[in-house]
Amino acid sequence: MKLAPGESFGEQVAKFKACLQKFNRVHSLTNYDDLDAVVRDSLSGVEFISCHPRIACDIGSGAGFPGLFLALALPLCEWHLFEPNRKKAAFLTYAKVSLALANVKIHAERVQDGAKLRADLISSRALMSARSLVEICRGFYDENTTFLLYKGSGAEAEAKEFRKEFTSAHCEIFSGKNALKNRKFLVIKGAK
């Protein structure tokens, strides 16, 4: 999928940065030196989304990477951001309201405890192994769901381990153009 951010995209990113800086002073959510690079990294996964998802979930959303930025980039998609840490979920709610993101719902809970829904896309950034993530997402996906997992240098070994258990799933590894150093994307389709 090609990313074509609207005119207000840069303004939205600037608003997000201001929200994060304000919240970070009190709650110490992140310590990124180059927030622009992290935003680009979050957006770089869009090129591996082959369809236009209607419903998507971001698991372990933390300070909004990549979930909030994918929601900004895909405004016609309904996004469900799952973050069990109350402080981080409060920030996500604050950012959602500040950015007027009507397409985002914040779930201050673990995904496995949430009300089930079928997502077209499930994203996550370096939260846990692909195998474990797919397992905790049972009830949120079917064989048509795409998993977009932001991984690091161990992606090859992780994909190999995943393929042993999910033999019918299609699992590919990609590198993004604007991703952080060592970023690999694990794209999984057909998990059952």
Residue ranges and their predicted role:
Residues E78, N103-K105, T146, T167-E172:
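Conserved beta-strand segments of alpha/beta enzyme cores
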Residues L20, K151, I188:
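Residue-level signal for inorganic ion chemistry
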Residues M1-P53, C57, K87-V104:
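Class I SAM-dependent transferase core
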Residues L127-R131:
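Alpha-helical transmembrane segments of helical membrane proteins, especially in multi-pass transport
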Residues G154-K192:
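Active-site capping/gating segments
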Residues V134-T146:
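A short glycine-rich, Lys/Arg-flanked "PGG" loop and its adjoining helix->strand segment in the class I
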Residues N144-E156:
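Conserved beta-strand signature within the Rossmann-like core of class I S-adenosyl-L-methionine
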Residues L43-S124:
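Conserved SAM/SAH cofactor-binding pocket of Class I
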